[in-house]
Amino acid sequence: DEVANGYGNTVEITLMGDNVARVADNGRGIPVDIHPKLKVSGVEVVFTQLHAGGKFNNDSYAYSGGLHGVGASVTNALSEWLTVEVFKDGNEYRQDFHSPEVNGKIKSGVPVGSLKLVGKTKKTGTQVTFKPDTRVFKNEKFNYQIIATRLREIAFLNKSITLILNDNRPENEGGTGKQSVYHYEGGLSDFVSYINAEKDAIYLKPIHITAEQDGVQVDVAMQHTTGYTENIFSFVNNIPTPDGGTHEIGFKSACTKVFNAYAQKNNLIKDKKLSALIGEDYREGMTAVISVRLKNVQFEGQTKTKLGNPEVKPLVEQLVSQKLDEFLNLKSSKSIAEKIVEKAMGAARTRDNVRRAKELSRQQKSINNANLVGKLASCTGKKPEFNELFIVEGDSAGGSAKQGRDRTTQAILPLRGKPLNVEKSSIDKILENEEFRTLISALGTGLGDDFNIDDLKYHKIIILADADQDGGHIRAILLTFFFRYMRRLITDGHVYIGMPPLYKLQKKDEVEYCYNDEELETKRQNFGRNYTLQRFKGLGEMNPEQLWETTMNPYNRSLTRVTIEDATEAEKSISTLMGDKSEPRKEYINEHANFNREDYFDKVVNG
């Protein structure tokens, strides 16, 4: 908040040994004066009192990411110890806090004495060093990549600032010695270019709009690609709003209105058979980032995922409409505007094809059921919250799964061959694909505008594929499909990856299944000598009883729930791994694959 409001330009985060972290800025420094009511320093108030952040003083910050004003005090409460150093007015101050255990209870964030003047300085700013409490965070360690991703995002959103991340942890604690510096002069324009780096844009530079009115700042960048899905990422006061809100609604409305007006004014829609262009046509292949800043933020719910301020919608719509109209009517923008309208007309033709296909399906009343005959082995349970759909690779494994399942709650949908790569396909091509038609019918939610989460027939959707390259590819294709066209299934926690065992250890009547090399090594040593070892190359090698016991039985199985921690990074990863460009994919593989990894099974068997 300090640097975002222009009171500093640099924040440096350092990860140190023993899971200690330090955060330093060159802002004004936390107030050190004695609070008139509480009779302690401003530093102590900020780090020990809830709702004491600067955002509750309207003169402190014009815009703040804090909704509840609890960040500093909660960090202190959840730390074994915390040290604050303030550099202000030529002086250096310091205060220490700790969380001792007294009579079996933790006293969190207790001051160790009062704020002390410890020296003179020419610096300004605040430095906080802390160690997360291991009594709360048992085995949690700072993840460099997660922190780096968030810092990169903040740097894109605040083009004037520099964010530095240092990894000074020793090697035995996972330290790398890396330093990452994030500073982007182009702001959101650079952000969109970063997201679209592995895509083919239909015009070179993103359209970048900035405006301010009534104390609200609006910053928008957008660029269209040859892809088929829209990707809109929105933020308010640097906080991601993955569920959108009034700022997204205003942006979409402005785009539809301005693009339509331009197309009509310049007589660009000459195909009379084409239905009227709508908002989703203009947003096909669009990547956009929307960032608004305002004082009194209203979120829907406590999780800050959806902006609720009603006044933001008309304001964003007005400002984006005005600036976008000005841009499109520049002589230099003529080719860009025409490409956007041409892309939208292609989307409208596809939409018309999809609509006609849906109408045809409705006329054939039993089409959905017909799609499933001989493919889906449904379950008898009538309550979706208890029902599970296993999407199983191959007929062989599908047959074993059908025999071994719990028929009351578990349905089986075998996949024959690899499904279509949806990242390279339009929606009408996807709907022509038999595997995806069957899957859509089985889930019951519909697709696109027809999608309704309340119609979901199975609250657990479990992808079961072999642990080889083909299995990994099938998982990636299915996850791409859910991310692109049924993202709500992921965000609501319905999509899982089944984890079949890699190995079977047997000694006489004793059998153990192992899910990774480390588990195999531990159990192998416990078994001693004279055991047999089997590696499962595919699900089809397991009989129905084995598949049930290891992979489908709710009491024994291991499932990984699919989540989206960062939508922009997920978008970029999918574009890299599943898109048309092979070079970024090759670079990703070279960076992340371990080509020197030893085959542990071969080592065990052959010594």
State what each model feature region is:
Residues 1-20, 24-26, 45, 49, ...:
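GHKL-family ATPase ATP-binding module
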Residues 5-7, 32-36, 402, 474:
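Conserved ATPase-coupling elements of RecA-like P-loop NTPase cores
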Residues 31-37, 137, 240-246, 312, ...:
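Flexible beta-alpha connector loops of hexameric P-loop NTPases
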Residues 33-53:
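Short conserved segment of the HATPase_c
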Residues 36-38, 305, 404-407, 476-478:
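Short, glycine/charged-enriched secondary-structure capping and boundary segments
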Residues 38-41, 70, 246, 434, ...:
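A generic structural signal for residues located within well-ordered alpha-helices
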Residues 39-43, 144, 475, 479:
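Amphipathic alpha-helical segments in well-structured domains
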Residues 349-368, 383-388, 399, 403-405, ...:
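C-terminal interaction appendages of subunits in large macromolecular complexes
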